[in-house]
């Protein structure tokens, strides 16, 4: 197989792309006869080691047979005649390259890896494994075998699905020993919570936060290893990323990896696969809950409980949503935004709307098959709001040691919260507690309440509505 990476026009671009090429292609190094980097200058110095990449990349570089090929005229595409694949680093040239390919009837495939302009450049890099002769079919057979040997024996009645939303904080003291816990994503960082929950399945799927070349992803993978040591369990990954994890994770984890296939491209209206044990694949969606957790739960159990899938108000569209700091890697967010600039240029409300569409339809599909879905923590997501239970809230009840409990429902009151709370919290000569219930405010009410709670831990308790949204539900929660 002969591949090229084009164009590289500056030293800084070379230093930026070399780590990506090594990270994604190192697992396939034995399949390449040629791996050329087409540079428009003469390379006279060593590459810089950049801190925001996983440092194992630079140790593996010496094992890659990469050649620098001078190409001073970046619009001279004649080198394409000798290649099978070209990895395009500048998507502005995609049209010109495609015209040249068509003109000369070339069979070469263009793989678009411009991480500054494309949101899914890294997914295209990851999916290159599907091009390797026979490897793709081998991985699908591994997937089928492991689903049957590792996933199928875990069938039980109750399944608990954990997300990483802020409201997951209400749920960590509950006893889940009567069912199977499926945890996900950055929950790996909190070993105390992992030991408490004892998940039997851990699911990960993100192309940049989990399978990418950044130091953020490196920290995630190190935590994944540490999590596995204290809690050995099945780890479900996309078949797309299986070569990454089977190459870079320790050998003692490989037998526990279960790759599951999802088809790309996929239309939103295509059906859900809610029996993985029969179909050995899932529908492509944009979130771990709908991609892996709910399909696994529907395949293994009858009662499905959801925790920590908070969603967000539509008005707060500067990011996907908020996370519980206890289960989130927060010290390297700036790093991953540098390494994957294009990924963060997505329109977050469009992503959110699609997520709502997938949840609504997947929940309906699962329930049509006789399964029950119960949401155990407050959520802005309408299908989860409708299925809320206060089962978790019961475990938060304490013997009343106050003479008076004041229940205060709140909705979009950011202008008045400080004034009202100061009045209520400064009352004298009475033993009381103040319980404030946020009814899914779309302004900054909840953030202000949580800040006040930290300053008044003995007297103020803040919850979101554990019932259907509305005044009655908020009062009932209190």
Name what the model sees in each region.
Residues 465-478:
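Glycine-rich, basic loop-to-helix element that forms the pyrophosphate-binding segment
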Residues 11-13, 408-419, 440:
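Active-site beta-to-alpha loop of glycosyltransferases that engages the nucleotide-sugar donor
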Residues 20-21, 413-426:
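Short, well-formed alpha-helical segments that are part of the catalytic scaffolds
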Residues 402-405, 433:
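Cell-envelope/extracellular polymer assembly enzymes that use nucleotide-activated donors
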Residues 438-447:
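A conserved acidic beta->alpha catalytic loop
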């Amino acid at each position: 197989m002969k591949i090229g990476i084009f164009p590289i026009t500056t030293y800084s671009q070379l230093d930026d792309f070399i780590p990506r090429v090594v990270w994604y292609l190192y697992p396939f190094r034995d399949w390449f006869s040629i791996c050329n980097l087409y540079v428009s200058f003469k390379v006279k110095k060593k590459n810089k080691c950049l801190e925001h990449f996983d440092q194992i990349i630079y140790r593996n570089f010496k094992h890659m047979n990469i050649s620098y090929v001078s190409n001073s005229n970046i619009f001279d595409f004649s080198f394409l005649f000798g290649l099978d694949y070209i990895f395009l680093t500048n998507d502005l040239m995609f049209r010109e390259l495609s015209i040249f390919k068509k003109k000369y009837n070339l069979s070469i495939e263009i793989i678009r890896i411009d991480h500054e302009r494309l949101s899914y450049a890294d997914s295209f890099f990851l999916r290159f494994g599907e091009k390797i002769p026979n490897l793709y079919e081998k991985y699908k057979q591994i997937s089928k075998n492991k689903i049957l040997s590792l996933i199928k024996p875990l069938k039980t009645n109750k399944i608990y699905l954990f997300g990483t939303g802020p409201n997951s904080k209400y749920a960590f003291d509950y006893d889940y020993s009567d069912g199977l816990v499926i945890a996900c994503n950055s929950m790996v960082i909190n070993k105390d919570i992992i030991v408490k929950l004892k998940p039997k399945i851990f699911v990960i799927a993100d192309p940049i936060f989990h399978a990418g070349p950044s130091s953020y992803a490196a920290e995630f993978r190190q935590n994944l290893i540490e999590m596995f040591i204290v809690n050995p369990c099945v780890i479900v990954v996309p078949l797309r990323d299986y070569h990454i994890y089977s190459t870079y994770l320790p050998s003692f984890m490989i037998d526990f990896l279960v790759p599951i296939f999802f088809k790309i491209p996929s239309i939103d209206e295509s059906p859900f696969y809610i029996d993985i044990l029969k179909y050995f694949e899932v529908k492509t969606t944009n979130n771990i809950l709908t991609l892996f957790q709910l399909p696994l739960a529907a395949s293994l159990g009858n009662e499905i409980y959801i925790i920590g899938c908070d969603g967000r108000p539509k008005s707060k569209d500067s990011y996907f949503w908020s996370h519980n700091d206890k289960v989130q890697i927060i010290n390297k967010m700036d790093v991953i935004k540098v390494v994957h600039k294009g990924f963060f240029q997505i329109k977050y409300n469009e992503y959110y709307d699609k997520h709502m569409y997938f949840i609504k339809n997947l929940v309906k599909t699962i329930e049509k098959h006789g399964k029950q879905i119960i949401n155990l923590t407050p959520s802005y997501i309408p299908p989860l709001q409708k299925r809320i239970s206060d089962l978790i809230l019961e475990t938060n009840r304490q013997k009343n040691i106050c003479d008076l409990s004041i229940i205060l429902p709140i909705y979009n009151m950011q202008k008045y919260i400080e004034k009202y709370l100061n009045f209520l919290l400064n009352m004298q000569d009475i033993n009381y507690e103040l319980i404030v219930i946020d009814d899914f405010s779309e302004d900054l009410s909840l953030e202000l309440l949580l800040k006040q709670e930290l300053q008044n831990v003995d007297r103020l308790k803040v919850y979101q509505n554990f019932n259907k949204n509305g005044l009655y539900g908020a009062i009932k929660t209190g």
